[in-house]
Amino acid sequence: MATLKELKQKISSVKNTQKTTRAMKLVSTAKLKRAEEAIMRSREYARKIDEVMHEISAKLASVKDSIELRAFAKIENVEKVDVIVITADKGLCGGFNIQTIKQTIKLIEELKEKKVKIRLKVIGKKAIEYFKFVGIDMYEEVIGLSAAPNYEKAAELIQKSYEDFVNEEIDNIITIHNGYVNKLTQQVYVKELLPIEVDVNDSQEFLEVEPDNDYETILETLVKKYIEYSLYYALLDSLAAEHSARMQAMDAATNNAKEMVHQLTLEFNKARQEAVTRELIEIVTAIEAMKK
């Protein structure tokens, strides 16, 4: 059984931890509010551009023989893909990072079964550390972008993949990130950015156009903006989810510390009471001995 001094030290240590986790929760709550605002400003645009690109893809069925953009092509034989993974640079956010990593490993295994080669581009220190530890090769490592999403940097990263896609060096571009649903929920999203799926059933009307070089140039510009903003939005979404997960984790840690302090205090009081009782018994025994 621990001594009174040891119990007192434990209580003090847990209380200090409780103060730290409470402070971290408050910081995460404030950061989450800002991240939520950024998501709200961007979500509708991201949804709309995604909707527009898939609608264009469907309508291009009428002129697909005249349009030579690989972004809208149906690629039968997929040999190599770019997988872009987004995690946090920091931990202490529950299962936020590991959920994304697990989904990535699952996708890698599925692609390997199909004999597909993978170029893994990893954004976020935690995933980079994990993949290095387990010996999974990475094509590109990016630290700092998930903590501070930047459109220009996201565009630069995705454009390298796009150029390789156009040049037929890769056949797919896939993103994986843990996204924000609400303050209590996060969800891992796996999205195939390119090629953009063509579904004739999605549209009853087709484009009535005379395809030319200008038309293809406009489409190519739209595709670039689409993939750039898709990655940028995924970064914003991931950051909001990270702060949400960390806020929950620190709240749970604070509550656990509070419960531990309560239990240790009970144990301390019990030990102190036993010590006092023991001392009283010794005093009474000594007095009785002196009387004899």
From Swiss-Prot:
Keywords: ATP synthesis, Cell inner membrane, Cell membrane, CF(1), Hydrogen ion transport, Ion transport, Membrane, Transport. It is found in: Cell inner membrane. The keyword Transferase does not apply. It comes from the Bacteria. SUPFAM superfamilies: ATP synthase (F1-ATPase), gamma subunit. InterPro entries: ATP_synth_F1_ATPase_gsu, ATP_synth_F1_gsu. Gene3D superfamilies: 3.40.1380.10, ATP synthase, gamma subunit, helix hairpin domain. It is a peripheral membrane protein. GO terms for molecular function: ATP binding; proton-transporting ATP synthase activity, rotational mechanism. One of its GO terms (cellular component) is proton-transporting ATP synthase complex. Coiled coil: none annotated. Pfam families: ATP-synt (PF00231). One of its GO terms (biological process) is proton motive force-driven plasma membrane ATP synthesis. Its main location: membrane. NCBIfam families: ATPsyn_F1gamma. Belongs to the ATPase gamma chain family. HAMAP family: ATP_synth_gamma_bact (MF_00815). Produces ATP from ADP in the presence of a proton gradient across the membrane. The gamma chain is believed to be important in regulating ATPase activity and the flow of protons through the CF(0) complex. F-type ATPases have 2 components, CF(1) - the catalytic core - and CF(0) - the membrane proton channel. CF(1) has five subunits: alpha(3), beta(3), gamma(1), delta(1), epsilon(1). CF(0) has three main subunits: a, b and c. This is ATP synthase gamma chain. It comes from Nautilia profundicola (strain ATCC BAA-1463 / DSM 18972 / AmH). The gene is atpG.
